[in-house]
Regions:
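N-terminal hydrophobic alpha-helix used for membrane targeting or insertion
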Residues: 11-12, 167
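Hydrophobic h-region of N-terminal signal peptides that target proteins for export
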Residues: 12-21
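Alpha-helix initiation/capping motif
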Residues: 5, 97, 195-199
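Bacterial N-terminal signal peptides that target proteins for export
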Residues: 1-9
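C-terminal/domain-edge helix-coil "capping" segments
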Residues: 22-60, 78, 118-119, 129-151, ...
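N-terminal segment of the mature soluble domain
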Residues: 63-149
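Histidine- and/or cysteine-centered catalytic micro-motif in compact active-site loops
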Residues: 8, 101, 158
Length: 218
């Protein structure tokens, strides 16, 4: 290498801005989805199956949420509040909740897995326009055993994250599917913020049953 080229290279290394800066690889982020409320006017008088929540992801900085036992407790708690919110804010819909679904699968004599083990957390992906197999088949058989509902409401996944202002953000991915065809009729990523996990979750649920929600397509 010539003396001139060595001097140019040395200058480039010492003086900022001569060589292009190397960007650090960005961290993978959860796909964003719009928080769209579900209008229940089009569901009035109809039976809608509600599957249980099976996935919760909590930041390790949130106390009391780590480990299988804590996650199981959060799932039961979140399901209970979700079901209560549906009954309180949309009593015009004939909701079929997870306890009834569990009894139905028990009566099936092993033909269907428990509704807690059907793999419905896959529906958290915002790219899915249809329910994939084998979940599609499970849901179709499940609603047939539990009364023949046309739609299935699936709370797919829940995320709990702390903020820098000592509050918590709870996000809930939920979809409404046509139980017969598997088509996704409605999807939301409901988000709420609060001083406690309960406050944040209640705020998230309030966005799901908004008065100006979008009715499912026929």
């Amino acid at each position: 290498m010539s003396s001139l080229r060595r001097r140019v290279l040395l200058l480039a290394l010492l003086v900022p801005g001569i060589l292009p800066a190397q960007k650090a690889p960005s961290k993978p982020q959860k796909a964003a989805a719009a928080a769209i409320g579900l209008s229940t006017a089009g569901l009035a008088g109809q039976m809608v199956t509600v599957l249980p929540l099976t996935m919760v992801v909590s930041d390790p900085r949130v106390p009391g949420t780590a480990g299988p036992k804590a996650r199981a407790g959060i799932l039961r708690w979140a399901d209970s509040l979700f079901n209560d919110a549906l009954l309180e804010r949309a009593p015009e819909v004939d909701w079929v909740f997870p306890p009834a679904l569990r009894r139905a699968t028990t009566r099936s004599g092993g033909l269907l897995p428990s509704p807690d083990r059907m793999g419905q957390s896959v529906m958290r992906s915002s790219n899915l326009k249809e329910t994939p197999d084998p979940l599609r088949g499970y849901v179709r058989q499940l609603v047939a055993l539990a009364g023949g509902a046309r739609f299935a409401l699936i709370p797919a996944a829940m995320w709990i994250t702390p903020t820098q202002s000592d509050t918590l953000v709870v996000e809930l991915s939920a979809v409404l599917t046509d139980a017969r065809t598997g088509r996704v009729m409605w999807r939301t990523l409901a988000a709420g913020k609060g001083e406690t996990m309960a406050d944040a979750y209640h705020a998230a649920l309030a966005t799901i049953l908004a008065a100006d929600g979008t009715p499912p397509a026929p």
